[in-house]
Structure formats: structure tokens, C-alpha cells
């Protein structure tokens, strides 16, 4: 094998190695950024779903005069949304979901991210005004507080 052929083969091999290392470098820089974007989108989906549950709880309170009881509260809310004529007719516009999610009373109380855990709901109906707390078990996000009336319908992420 003469020197010209050997140099040509080495040049081709080194070119392929440079392209492979360049691709690896690109992926090592953009990969973590893409994961951050995916995590942010999931967080926004969960928060939007929690805001929809808050809106449903406030609608329930407006119609019934109080919040659902603590025991079976979210199930009571789902049953109410399935039977209320306004919620049936306009539920998708009343409780807006972040695409690609769609409104469904059954899935409203579940986190949109796998493993689809139920939101935690607690109510303190002995205080005036009655207070509720809605919490995502997979994060620190919550809406409202059981002890402070100043956090009326406030979310923890704002």
C-alpha cells in the first residue's frame, strides 16, 4: 500500500470520527435543554389542570353553596360535573385544558402526567370563609391554603 492510499484512508476515517464527535457534542449540549423544555411543558399541563379543578370547585360552590366534602370530595365534584347541564354543555370551554389534553370530568381530577395520580383535596368548612386546598402529590404545587384566608384561590407557583 503506498503512502497516498494510506493517507486517503486515514483522512476518510478521521473525517468520519470528526463528524461522529461533532454529532455527539451537539447532542450533549441540546439533549439536557430538550429535557428542560419537556419538564416545563409537563409542569404547565399539571398547573393548567389544577386551575381547571379550582374553577370546577368554585363552580360547585357557586351552585351548591359550599365546597364538596373532604371524604369523596373530588368524586363528588366529578359526579356533579357529569350531571350539571351547564357543565355538560359547556365543560370544554369552562374548564380549558392545555393541548393535547381534552376536557373530561373523569380525568379532570387526575394529573395529566404518568402515573396519573389523583390530586389531593382537603377542605376546612369550619372557618369563614370555608377554605380548601388542592395539591399535586408529584410536586410542591398547590392551590389555596387551609389556614390563611389571604391565599383565597391563590396558587403556590405565582
PLM regions: where:
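Hydrophobic membrane-insertion alpha-helices, especially the h-region
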Residues: 10-27
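N-terminal positive-inside, membrane-proximal cytosolic segments immediately preceding the first
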Residues: 1-12
Amino acid at each position: 500500500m503506498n503512502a497516498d492510499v494510506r493517507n486517503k484512508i486515514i483522512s476518510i476515517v478521521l473525517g468520519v470520527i470528526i463528524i461522529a464527535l461533532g454529532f455527539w457534542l451537539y447532542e450533549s449540549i441540546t439533549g439536557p435543554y430538550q429535557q428542560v423544555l419537556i419538564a416545563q411543558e409537563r409542569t404547565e399541563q399539571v398547573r393548567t389542570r389544577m386551575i381547571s379543578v379550582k374553577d370546577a370547585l368554585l363552580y360547585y360552590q357557586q351552585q351548591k353553596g359550599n365546597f364538596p366534602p373532604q371524604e369523596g370530595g373530588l368524586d363528588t365534584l366529578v359526579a356533579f360535573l357529569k350531571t350539571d347541564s351547564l357543565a355538560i354543555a359547556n365543560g370544554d370551554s369552562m374548564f380549558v385544558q392545555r393541548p393535547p389534553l381534552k376536557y373530561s370530568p373523569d380525568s379532570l381530577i387526575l394529573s395529566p402526567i404518568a402515573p396519573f395520580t389523583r390530586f389531593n383535596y382537603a377542605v376546612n368548612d369550619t372557618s369563614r370563609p370555608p377554605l380548601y386546598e388542592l395539591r399535586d402529590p408529584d410536586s410542591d404545587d398547590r392551590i389555596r391554603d387551609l389556614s390563611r384566608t389571604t391565599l383565597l384561590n391563590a396558587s403556590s407557583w405565582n
